[in-house]
């Protein structure tokens, strides 16, 4: 299995699929799956290519999800090995996307292939959801596929997302949920004027200080068994013209909350509105909800994944919900139990991104064992 995974990973890495470009990656995968009797459905939206592939029928539907797009390489001269050469050095596979996530995507594909070969009459459905729009806008990828499936009443019961979840060693972390993410774009209005005549102006920076203190120190919740407390961070703040003699007429504040299941986006919006009213600030605000929090808890997929990781790596993984958002947030909206498991994330989005060849082989074994537990005939 390992050699097949590495060969496929190298083929995919050599295709410079900067998001949302796919550069033929999904076609390579589709041709392999078609030979094994998978039904293929292409779901293009905008400039994004999506593939929905299935083998078998009925329940449960166990889906593997991944993406073929990668982030830009940056200054290519800083790379020790060319980012799209897919070179193996000292048992490490180097290249953009090696860890995030062409390596684990290859492991997902090969695991599905091997399972179907060994169990042609398996119960339920093996599915793969592959997109080229995860790293950039995430507007025409998994979210659109999920909308399509939901519109026709087609379920996903369990989903393994192959994101690089591991920290220090393969298998030390399984993501069994993710926090929600919401961003506020706030404009506090004042009156512009000369700094020598403050009585003729209103400085929005000064009038907002008490509000900003309350906003940044407010305790939203205490977290729970699975999530840390909700956190808020100011990401950007701007006022003034750049001149030292002009009182600004407007203050711009952009802030983001990573929130747990103890609060909702509506609770957050209402509380911020309450604070703004309390401090009598003339303002306008807009919100961008990137994703709701989701949690798989200790369900069947979590149990199957933990058991598979223990069998393959001989270590007991820690269940964790920290970190950024992933496409799992969209799939969870279907009522699916979602976990993320994949290789080490130490080099993702970095120069000299790389992944252990041995770890990719073990990832494939873990994915295979998950299918065995949930679908074996």
From Swiss-Prot:
Subunit record text: Homodimer.
Active site: 69, 134 (proton acceptor)
GO molecular function, a single term: acetylornithine deacetylase activity
Record EC number: 3.5.1.18
Function: Catalyzes the hydrolysis of N-succinyl-L,L-diaminopimelic acid (SDAP), forming succinate and LL-2,6-diaminopimelate (DAP), an intermediate involved in the bacterial biosynthesis of lysine and meso-diaminopimelic acid, an essential component of bacterial cell walls.
Keyword Aminoacyl-tRNA synthetase: no
Name of the top EC class for this enzyme: hydrolase
Residues where Zn(2+) 2 binds: 100, 135, 349
GO biological process: one example: lysine biosynthetic process via diaminopimelate
Binding annotation for Zn(2+) 1: 67, 100, 163
InterPro entries per UniProt: ArgE/DapE_CS, Bact_exopeptidase_dim_dom, DapE_proteobac, Peptidase_M20, Peptidase_M20_dimer, Peptidase_M20A
Cofactor note: Binds 2 Zn(2+) or Co(2+) ions per subunit.
Reaction(s) this enzyme catalyzes, per UniProt: N-succinyl-(2S,6S)-2,6-diaminopimelate + H2O = (2S,6S)-2,6-diaminopimelate + succinate
Cross-referenced Pfam families: M20_dimer (PF07687), Peptidase_M20 (PF01546)
Family per record: Belongs to the peptidase M20A family. DapE subfamily.
Pathways involved: Amino-acid biosynthesis; L-lysine biosynthesis via DAP pathway; LL-2,6-diaminopimelate from (S)-tetrahydrodipicolinate (succinylase route): step 3/3
Cofactor(s) the protein requires to work: Zn(2+); Co(2+)
Organism whose genome encodes this protein: Actinobacillus pleuropneumoniae serotype 3 (strain JL03)
Listed name of the protein: Succinyl-diaminopimelate desuccinylase
Keywords: Amino-acid biosynthesis, Cobalt, Diaminopimelate biosynthesis, Hydrolase, Lysine biosynthesis, Metal-binding, Zinc
């Amino acid at each position: 299995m390992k050699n097949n995974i590495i060969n496929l990973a190298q083929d995919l890495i050599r295709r410079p699929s900067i998001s949302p470009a796919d550069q033929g990656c999904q076609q390579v995968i589709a041709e392999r799956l078609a030979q094994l009797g998978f039904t293929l459905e292409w779901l293009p939206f905008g400039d994004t290519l999506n593939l929905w592939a299935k083998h078998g029928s009925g329940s449960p539907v166990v889906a593997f999800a991944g993406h073929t797009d990668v982030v830009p390489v940056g200054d290519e001269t800083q790379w020790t090995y060319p980012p799209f050469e897919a070179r193996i050095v000292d048992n490490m596979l180097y290249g953009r996307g090696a860890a995030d996530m062409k390596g684990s995507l290859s492991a997902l594909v090969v695991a599905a292939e091997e399972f179907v070969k060994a169990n042609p009459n398996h119960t339920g459905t093996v599915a793969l959801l592959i997109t080229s729009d995860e790293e950039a806008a995430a507007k025409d990828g998994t979210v659109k596929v999920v909308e399509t499936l939901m519109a026709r009443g087609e379920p996903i019961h369990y989903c393994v997302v192959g994101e690089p979840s591991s920290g220090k060693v393969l298998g030390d972390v399984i993501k069994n949920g993710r926090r929600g993410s919401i961003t506020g774009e706030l404009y506090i209005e004042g009156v512009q004027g000369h700094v020598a005549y403050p009585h003729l102006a209103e400085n929005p920076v000064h009038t907002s200080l008490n509000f900003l203190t309350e906003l940044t120190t407010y305790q939203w919740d205490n977290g729970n068994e699975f999530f840390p407390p909700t956190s808020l961070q100011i990401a950007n703040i701007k006022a003034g013209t750049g001149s030292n003699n002009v009182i600004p007429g407007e203050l711009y504040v952009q802030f983001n909350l990573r929130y747990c299941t103890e609060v909702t986006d509506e609770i957050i919006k209402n509380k911020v509105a309450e604070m703004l009213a309390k401090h009598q600030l003339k303002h306008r605000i807009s919100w961008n909800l990137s994703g709701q929090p989701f949690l798989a808890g200790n369900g069947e997929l979590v149990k199957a994944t933990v058991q598979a990781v223990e069998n393959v790596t001989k270590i007991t993984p820690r269940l964790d919900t920290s970190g950024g958002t992933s496409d799992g947030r969209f799939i969870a909206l279907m009522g699916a139990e979602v976990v993320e498991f994949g290789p080490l994330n130490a080099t993702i989005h970095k120069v000299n991104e790389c992944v252990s060849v041995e770890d990719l082989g073990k990832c494939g074994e873990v994915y295979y064992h998950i299918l065995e537990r949930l679908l074996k005939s």
